[in-house]
């Protein structure tokens, strides 16, 4: 869990934004520097997303240091494509995030003008 933020769909992709009292469930991987460089390219770092070091609370364990990609500012809310939405749902299922904490709310906010 990452605390004090919530999910948003911006330009049709997920990011997190500050939101006091809210939390976002996350999946955690240990990656090598080479893997990180590959993910950087995939995520459009540093132009589309930037990286931030965060404390992540692990279920059944304590906090760990982690890194998250956050979308650069200025991008409007926008609905995700069907393909991207299905990919996100699959990720939630893969990590057994059953109640989809905040995901449906982010989807609904993306519909608003």
Which positions does each model-derived feature cover?
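Glycine-aromatic micro-motifs
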Residues: 1-113
């Amino acid at each position: 869990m990452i605390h004090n933020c919530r999910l948003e769909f911006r330009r049709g992709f997920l990011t997190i934004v500050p939101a006091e009292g809210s939390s976002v469930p996350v999946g955690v991987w240990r990656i090598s520097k080479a893997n990180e460089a590959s993910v950087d390219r995939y995520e459009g770092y540093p132009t589309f997303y930037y990286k931030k070091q965060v404390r992540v609370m692990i279920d059944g364990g304590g906090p760990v240091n982690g890194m998250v990609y956050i979308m650069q500012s200025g991008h409007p809310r926008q609905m995700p494509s069907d393909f991207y939405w299905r990919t996100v749902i699959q990720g939630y299922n893969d990590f057994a995030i059953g109640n989809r904490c905040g995901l449906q709310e982010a989807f609904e906010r993306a519909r608003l003008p």
